């Protein structure tokens, strides 16, 4: 897939960037690929990654997706782009919604426009379950990012830049997520702070996140959105599983939902489920290719009506305590924390 090609990863020093680079470095992909460009704004994280990975095919570019010129300059000669740069903390985006817009919407506009300008072959845009029926600023900004990508995809001619979207559930042990928080609280002997015990979240590993992007990269057509089917758990069961893994008897305190949080998340809306292709472990949501000539649709009508429910963390496979423990123990992050406990 990547033979003699140049790949750019925006936000490349984040959790996804580290995971995909780890995959590439452990496989033959790193031997086949021409160059991987890490584009991000944090020079310290770039320096740490440069030292830790120490590979001649990794090139580092300081820049911000908010600045079109910096992303356009860095994208010269790039064949493929994984767009992972984002503001993703829900409460932070609630307090600073314009910052979410500047990065997640306008930044995405810059990345997509630069990719088209530089005749990039394919772009995979990383989105989130919070973009489906959004109630918070982060989800709204990601929903608009998806709309931007699909709108631009709709305007592309055959042979031009292919734009696809991947939509994640909760990525376990990613930076700023609840699993590192719970483990920190356990190790410090503090109370485990749970927002709402019956709240459910999809459980997706960083390995799964890389699998999803590579699947979309291999199979994506113009304007496709890809979702990976994932199990879910309540937050309370997740906390108790970590307690058992670490042999902790820390008290649990319920603190109530944070700003902008939903009781459960949706990965596919009921409207999208009506047109989604079931690909086994994934759903593909094809682009709506209709134009603005609506008159004919009043005559022809819709071919399909949404008869299905949305795909949510409430109606997907729900893991019990034993199953959550088994899943958590497959995570490198949890194993490393156990060694250092």
Swiss-Prot record:
One of its GO terms (biological process) is lipopolysaccharide biosynthetic process. Its EC number is 5.1.3.2. Keywords: Isomerase, Lipopolysaccharide biosynthesis. Signal peptide: none annotated. Pfam families: Polysacc_syn_2C, Polysacc_synt_2. It catalyses: UDP-alpha-D-glucose = UDP-alpha-D-galactose. The keyword Disulfide bond does not apply. It comes from the Bacteria. Gene3D superfamilies: NAD(P)-binding Rossmann-like Domain. One of its GO terms (molecular function) is UDP-glucose 4-epimerase activity. SUPFAM superfamilies: NAD(P)-binding Rossmann-fold domains. Belongs to the polysaccharide synthase family. Epimerizes UDP-galactose to UDP-glucose. This is UDP-glucose 4-epimerase. It comes from Rickettsia typhi (strain ATCC VR-144 / Wilmington). The lineage of its organism: Bacteria, Pseudomonadati, Pseudomonadota, Alphaproteobacteria, Rickettsiales.
